[in-house]
Swiss-Prot record:
Organism this protein belongs to: Helicobacter pylori (strain J99 / ATCC 700824) (Campylobacter pylori J99)
NCBIfam families the record matches: PRK00984.1-3 (NF002154), tRNA_TruD_broad (TIGR00094)
Purpose of the protein: Responsible for synthesis of pseudouridine from uracil-13 in transfer RNAs.
UniProt-recorded name of the protein: tRNA pseudouridine synthase D
Alphabetized GO MF terms: RNA binding; tRNA pseudouridine(13) synthase activity
Domain TRUD: 160-335
Amino acid sequence: MNLNFMPLLHAYNHVSIDFHFNSSARDFCVHEVPLYEFSNTGEHAVIQVRKSGLSTLEMLQIFSQILGVKIAELGYAGLKDKNALTTQFISLPKKYAPLLEKNTSNFQERNLKILSLNYHHNKIKLGHLKGNRFFMRFKKMTPLNAQKTEQVLEQIAQFGMPNYFGSQRFGKFNDNHKEGLKILQNETKFAHQKLNAFLISSYQSYLFNSLLSKRLEISKIISAFSVKESLEFFKQKNLSVHSNALKALKNQAHPFKILEGDVMRHYPYGKFFDALELEKESERFLNKEAVPTGLLDGKKALYAKNLSLEIEKGFQHNLLSGHAKTLGSRRFFWVFVENITSQYIKEKAQFELEFYLPKGSYASALLKEIKHEKGENNDEF
C-alpha cells in the first residue's frame, strides 16, 4: 500500500470556502467535559487547569517540577492542543493539594491557572472524558463565505460529518504511520513501549482514514449515478452487489450509505451489532441512534461481513492482526456535531463558531469539511 498521504473525500459537495484560521490561544479554545461528576471526597485531588502554549505532557512536567509529584501519579483524560487555550481536569494524590495555592504565581508564570479544586475516589485515566467544547474564530471571512459556512453547518447539524483522525495522530512531518509500519515489520523499534504503541496506532489511524474515504467515494457514486452506472463501478472493483440492493442503498436518506455486513454501534456509547436490516438501520443512523463503524485492525478486532468486509479487506494488515500487543477495535465512521452556535461579525470580517464533539473526534475534521480545501489527509493544526 502507498503510505503517502492521499486526498480524503469530503462529505458535502460545496465549493471551497476561503478564510483564515490561526491555531492560537486567541482563536482556538478547547474545554474538556468530564465523564462523571467528582464526589468531592476521596484520596485524589482533582483540579481544573487552564493552559496556553503548552502540550498536556509539558504541563504535567511543570506540575511534577513545582509540586514534587511523580508524573506517574498524575492522571489525565486526554491530550489537549498546544496551540490553543484549553481547560482540562488533572488528578493527583490528595497530599499535594495544600501546595497548589502556595504556588499560584509559579503556575501563572508558566501559562497555567488552576480554576477549581475538587476530590474524587479514583485517579483520572485516559478516556475518562465525555467530550470537548470548542471555540474557533475564522478571519478574513467575506459575507458571502459566511453565508456559505452557515449553509454547510446546517448540513452538518442535520447529518453529521466523517470521523477522520486529525493531523495530531501523524506528527509534525506526517510520517508517524510510516514509523508504525516499520515497527510492525521489525525494521525499527524505540526504547519506550508507549511510543511504539502510539506509532502503531498512527498506522491504524492512517488505514482507518483511507477506508473511510473509500466508503465516502462509494456512497457518493451510489447517490450520484444510476443503478446501471453504479453496478459497472462495483463490477470494476470486483465487489459483489445486486441491482435491487443498489436501489435500496440509493433510497437511504443519509449521505453515508450503510452497506450489507456493516458493524454498527449504538451512539454515542453502546454495544456493537451487525447491520441485518439495512432500511431499519439507515433510519436509526438518520436519527443519530446508531452509527456504522470502521476497522482499527488488530489481534482481537471485530470484522465486518459480506460487502462491507470485501471493501474492508483492502485496509487490513496481517502484521496488525498478528501483533500480540495490538488488540484492535472499531471506530465510528461518522460523528454528530452538537450545540453548534455561530455569529458573523461583518465589521471585523470574522466568523465565530462554537460546538461540542464526543471524545476521540477532532475539530480539525470539522474545519476540513467546512473549508473544502483540496489537499492531503492531514490538517495544519
